[in-house]
């Protein structure tokens, strides 16, 4: 239990209620497929960041709840389509949407979620000045473009073994951090924050998102399958060029590199081959990856500390969430 549990639960429950009311309609199977991943829980980290960022600048809660729901629905849309592209079978401990409902319906479910995200954001922005509405839609739309670019780059990486660290960081700043940045900056924007504070909150989200993805890559090697909610070592099997793989290939001995490369991207790799590869990766890059995540976490806190708002509880809550991001185990 944390000091912030009641605070967080109120936000999560309100956002969940809005999502449930919006992801329903007259075509039951489509809406069932669209709502499927929401039934498995999830951290709701992005709507928490958005709502608390709004609180930080004295924003209206109901408006933030709808904007947070828009962000979470958009995030879920990306998960549905990512699982199709990565051919993943499990997400959050459940069969992925395309596995449970078939590929055509999963694609439609993703499309529906994409549209519903905009519908929710439209509701969130009602009554705001036109300039604020345009800025919010611009941030939201650009985040989708940037995420799509990041996913494409990530897929290209699967066919390369010469990825540099900066290329990886650029990729995750698009694929993952863009939506964190959208969450924190839209939250500040709809609460009336000035341009400099919106920029600082965007920087907070970007750095936090990078730290989050690095930790996610670490957990892909260290968490057990039940905690992770997907098959352990799936990143190795899929050939994902995480920071851990990049650093290992840079530092390991030639015979160790052969072991890693034999398993990397090999859909039929045995459990023993995956474990041997994972052990080598942990040996060379685990500490480095943790330190890198810590660096971006500190960058996020530095940006947060510079905002003009001195609202105590929301500021502390965002710092708590940021720390959770790098200390989490799933």
UniProtKB/Swiss-Prot annotation:
Quote the record's note on pH dependence: Optimum pH is 5.8.
Please share the entry's free-text remark on the cofactor. Answer: Binds 2 Mg(2+) ions per subunit.
Transmembrane residue ranges: none
Q: Recount the entry's temperature dependence annotation.
A: Thermostable. Most of the activity for GGPP synthase remains even after heating at 60 to 70 degrees Celsius for 100 minutes, although 90% of the enzyme activity is lost on incubation at 90 degrees Celsius for 10 minutes.
UniProt keyword Glycosyltransferase present: no
Q: What pathway does this protein act in?
A: Isoprenoid biosynthesis; geranylgeranyl diphosphate biosynthesis; geranylgeranyl diphosphate from farnesyl diphosphate and isopentenyl diphosphate: step 1/1
Keyword annotations for this protein, in alphabetical order, are: Lipid biosynthesis, Lipid metabolism, Magnesium, Metal-binding, Transferase
Q: Which GO terms describe its biological process?
A: geranylgeranyl diphosphate biosynthetic process
Give a short account of what the protein does. Answer: Catalyzes the condensation of isopentenyl pyrophosphate with the allylic pyrophosphates to yield geranylgeranyl diphosphate (GGPP) which is a precursor of the ether-linked lipids. It is able to use dimethylallyl diphosphate (DMAPP), geranyl diphosphate (GPP), and (all-E)-geranyl diphosphate (E-FPP) as an allylic substrate.
Cited PANTHER family: GERANYLGERANYL PYROPHOSPHATE SYNTHASE (PTHR12001), SHORT CHAIN ISOPRENYL DIPHOSPHATE SYNTHASE (PTHR12001:SF85)
Entry's NCBIfam families? Answer: GGPP_syn (NF041003)
Protein name per Swiss-Prot or TrEMBL:
Geranylgeranyl diphosphate synthase
Q: Which organism is it from?
A: Sulfolobus acidocaldarius (strain ATCC 33909 / DSM 639 / JCM 8929 / NBRC 15157 / NCIMB 11770)
Name the encoding gene, please. gds
């Amino acid at each position: 239990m944390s000091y912030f549990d009641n605070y967080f639960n109120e936000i999560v429950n309100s956002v969940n209620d809005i999502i449930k009311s919006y992801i329903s309609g007259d075509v039951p199977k489509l809406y069932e497929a669209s709502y499927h991943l929401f039934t498995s829980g999830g951290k709701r980290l992005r709507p928490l960041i958005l709502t608390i960022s709004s609180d930080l600048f004295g924003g209206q809660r109901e408006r933030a709840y709808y904007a947070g729901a828009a962000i979470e629905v958009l995030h879920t849309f990306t998960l549905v389509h990512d699982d199709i592209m990565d051919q993943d079978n499990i997400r959050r401990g459940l069969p992925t949407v395309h596995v449970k409902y078939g590929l055509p319906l999963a694609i439609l479910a993703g499309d529906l979620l994409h549209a519903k995200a905009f519908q929710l954001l439209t509701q969130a922005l009602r009554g705001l000045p036109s300039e604020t509405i345009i800025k919010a839609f611009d941030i939201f739309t650009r985040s989708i473009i940037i995420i799509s670019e990041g996913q494409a780059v990530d897929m290209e990486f699967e066919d390369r073994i010469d990825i540099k660290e900066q290329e990886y960081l650029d990729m995750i700043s698009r694929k993952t951090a863009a939506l964190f940045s959208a969450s924190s900056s839209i939250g500040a924007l709809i609460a009336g924050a000035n341009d400099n504070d919106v920029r600082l909150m965007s920087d907070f989200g970007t750095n936090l998102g990078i730290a989050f993805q690095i930790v996610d890559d670490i957990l892909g090697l260290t968490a057990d399958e039940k905690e992770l909610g997907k098959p352990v070592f799936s990143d190795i099997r899929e050939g994902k060029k995480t920071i851990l793989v990049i650093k290992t290939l840079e530092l390991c001995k030639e015979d160790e590199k052969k072991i890693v490369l034999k398993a990397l991207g090999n859909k039929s790799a045995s459990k023993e081959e995956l474990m041997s590869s994972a052990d080598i990766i942990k040996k060379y890059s685990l500490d480095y990856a943790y330190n890198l995540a810590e660096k971006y976490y500190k960058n996020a806190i530095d940006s947060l500390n510079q905002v003009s708002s001195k609202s105590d509880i929301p500021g502390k809550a965002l710092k708590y969430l940021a720390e959770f991001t790098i200390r989490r185990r799933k």
